[in-house]
């Protein structure tokens, strides 16, 4: 009887331990990551691995990837999906959230809020693509907005804070964005070789 109780306790403890382990992306869903497009359509874009860098004086971790690009550069949907949010907050500025297949969501943050000669004088018309709204169905590569530095990014260089979440949890996507950039760069620099490059 004691042995039986001990086994039950061990079983319950092991179940609890498993439930506390952070959820990892299932292997079958890596197909989505391997097929995403680079989120900014501008050859002058650049980025580095800033996942979990300390921000706000060390008060928070950076759970995304910042892509620097010229102000007003086109932001594109990295995959097919449906627009979940088109909004403005004091911290994020103008931002977009798009739902994708199998529990994925992409976030595009700090979109443009400036017009020529007048910082912060712009509105959603300089942040989002024309007539872009919640509920829209978007295709991979479709222009959805424009690079800027709205929200708490005011005063920084123009950039897109890009994030991918799986079942609500932000993921470290640097390697996949680097791969998407390499494909984008090749297609821009060597357009005649487009077909062969798409195979790789």
Where are these regions (language model features)?
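N-terminal secretory signal peptides that target proteins for export/translocation
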Residues: 1-3
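Glycine-rich acetyl-CoA-binding "A-motif" of GNAT/NAT acetyltransferases
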Residues: 143
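A generic structural motif
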Residues: 68, 99-101, 165
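Acidic, glycine-anchored pre-beta loop/turn
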Residues: 129-138
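Active-site loop architecture of trypsin-fold serine endopeptidases
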Residues: 147-161
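Sec-dependent N-terminal signal peptides of Gram-positive bacterial secreted proteins and lipoproteins
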Residues: 5-23
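Zn2+-dependent peptidoglycan hydrolase active-site motif and core
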Residues: 78-130, 157-159
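Surface-exposed, glycine-biased beta-strand/turn segments
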Residues: 20-95, 114, 139-140, 149, ...
